[in-house]
Amino acid sequence: MLGGAKWLWGLVLALIDLWRALGPLWLRIPLLVGGVLILGYHVAQHYLRPNLTQETIYQVKYLNTGWSDEQRNTFYYTPQGTELLGLEYDWLVNLELPLSVERLASEENMRGWGFIVDPQQRPSPTNPGNLPVGFARHTDQQTGRQKVDLGCAMCHTGELHYQGTALRIDGGQSMQSIATAQRGEFITTLGASVFETLYVPTKWDRFAERLVGDDEETRAKLKKAFKAFSSKLKDFAQGAGAARLYPVVEGRGRTDAVGRIANVVFGFDLDEESNYRVADAPASYPFIWDIWRFDWVQYTGFTNQAMARNVGESLGVLAPIKLVNQQGELLGPEEFGETVVDIDGMHCVEGTLRDLKPPSWPEDILGKIDIAQALQGKELFAEQCHSCHGPHPSRSYAWPVATEPGQNPAKELAVNWQWDKAGQLSEVDGQTVRQDWRETIWSLPWVATDVIGTDPKLASNFMHNKYDASKLVPGSEPVNAGDGLQVLLNRLVPLLYRKWGVSEEQVANFDGLNVPFRIENKLAYTSRPLHGVWATPPFLHNGSVPTIYDLLSPLRARPTTFYVGNREYDPKKLGYKTSYAPGSFLHDTAIEGNRNSGHLFTDEEAPGRIGDLLTEAQRMALLEYIKVMGNPQFDQALQGDPLNWDNFPSPPQDPQLRAACERSHRWHFPQTTAQLSHGHGK
């Protein structure tokens, strides 16, 4: 120890001698300051370095059928009225990385953050900034400026990579992390870029020059608007977006959607800080190519109606809305609910999705199907999986509705009888109902959390986290997120219909297939059909199992830690590669909310047991069938597949779909409307 102290003292003396040898004090001080600045710059540059995956893509192949190119483009870039706190489209296109002159939203950077960019894509009328899938834009009705609009496709488009080929999965689950406020991720890098641009003159000059040129008056207006945006960004980061509220890292491909929606709506929008709740149950973005068939949607199956689901989602994705005044008091009827939520855009996207089919296994890229093995898997699926995953076709429902004040036949917490009766009504056994327009529906069974055994955190948070909604209903008791959204949306959606000119005759269609808005609260998860599930890793609702092979394996054989972010696909086990790579996140299943328990195939009586222990041969047979399950191209080879997706009824025709798409595009893209075409109603 004494020798170590002498060594340190000698080092101090050597540094003092070096300091004196640099020359007189007037020279040493500037040298010291310069050295500190250079060191600080390099430290900051390292700290702010983007956390990017490294991917090399030579070609893109689209695996879903049912869509024309125009329909795909409609899904990718139709706005729904969300915003990124007012970030203008041209601002995002022209911002630079922190401490760099490189464009922040370059193809390489955006792909590195997990967004989807086709190497061959070029600027187009609907995507003039050449941004990734889902980065749409809408026109602010007050200023005429175009804002970044985070569209449905951003979270619900997937991509699998295999040896340089990107396999596009329309309607699949994305692998971006736009909500994750971790060092080097998109949202934190954007924030650093905004504040550096605002306060570093040389960076501001480059930014302003690209946007408005040299005119000082226009530059002053730009700076005022940009500063206002930076203030919103800061306020949100200290409120609904505060990292402390999201202690379980979401990472690539996940977000606690319901928890974030609740924090935004009941905390940020209602200006009620006491409503912020810890949201620590991240879930994978669900795949959506068949949701129009479902009776109930979301992982816990808590709602049923397309329009209410989409409006609620848009509010959670920061669609600006006026609910309260500057004093936090509820606004009067003249101002309440002012928002840019795009009802036409939502109806356009929802209707377009009905034509989308699941992805087809590409034998030319991922390997030929072993038909004999797939036939064995078909029998195993019927024995072990069908009872939960179905599909379970059912006669469409006749939903009882209220037709006058005081009625509540569905026993909901809140009901808007005028909206209920605005649909297409009929009588069944003396009860006024809305008859669902679908020929058949898929009935999704709820499986209680203590039966399925998967991580219960998401369902538990949904049931037990309570929010004060008394500003909306004075004197009311605290409610969970589902009931609170019902209270708000029962009032808001009819207002939006009036604003967008939706006639009384059109309400049933815009609601979605004449379905009234309902909420169901259960400590359970729904069990959905699995067409195309091979293309949607990782698995279970929280993404805690990397491959389907692992999911079919005993719990002790499932990985307890693995990395997420690498989109390179494993066609043997049906999942992503899980080794560490730049840009990846560690998924630790020991953390509550991340657990990989349940959904077990075992001969032991254990919580979460759903089937018998599978041999290696049985697992591989199931995997082979899952690759082609329901695919009509393999129906004959499989000696008739009862899950052939072409055997299920087609969606009802939507006579208002084309007009809704055209109205949305005409408003937001007036200069390009003549160049847009749509492939609906095929």
Residue ranges and their predicted role:
Residues 1-25:
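N-terminal Lys/Arg-rich, disordered targeting/topogenic segments
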Residues 15, 22-31, 37-682:
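Periplasmic c-type cytochrome electron-transfer domains
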